[in-house]
Amino acid sequence: MTATLPYPANVFVQMLQALDHILDTARTSPSGPPGARIVHARLAPDMFDLSQHVELTCRHALEAEARLAGRPDAVSIDLEGETLEALQALIRRTIDRLRDRAPGEATRTFGSDVEVHTTTGQLFRMSGNEMLDDWAFPQFYFHLVTAYAILRNNGVGLGIRDYLGHMRRHLVSGEDASGGARAES
């Protein structure tokens, strides 16, 4: 359960679980799985493909946690294959790493300076809070939503309920995310 994890690990985990569900929906689609080509699908020729967006979603979650713990650049991502199952395995390993790391991280540097070194050679210096608000969360959500959009663009039947499935736990009345009436408790 993500509620027992400290912030921001709880946010990353619940949205990574949504991404895992989204990929599972693609893999088990009633019209059949989209096939191996889907992991290389893009929204535009100059954009990353699905596998790169999933990898970057995982990377930004792990890097944010590492920076807050005072361990910048302590992240390695190993994608083991080019299938939806391999992408799901990467997501699940990332979730496990966030869960394993989070309880023991007593020292958080929300107010202290952290650095972000980009692959293009840029260096950004900001507080931990600024890093989350201005870098980590925007990057994380951009890549997650783009992965969702690639699947939608390739005919996978997804909707907002797949993306916000975690909101079911807050539903008080009306229909649950599966479309059925929610029983009052």
Predicted regions and their residues:
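Acidic/histidine-rich alpha-helical segments that form the ligand environment
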Residues: 80-119, 123-151
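Structural signal for well-ordered, non-membrane alpha-helices
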Residues: 16, 20-27, 62-65, 92-99, ...
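Basic/polar N-terminal segments that are highly enriched at the extreme N-terminus
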Residues: 1-9, 21, 169-185
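Long amphipathic alpha-helical coiled-coil segments
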Residues: 70-82, 153-159
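Alpha-helical scaffold segments that form or flank carboxylate-/histidine-based iron centers
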Residues: 3-11, 35-59, 77-87, 123-139, ...
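C-terminal or internal capping secondary-structure element at the end of a domain, subdomain, or sheet
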Residues: 129-174, 179
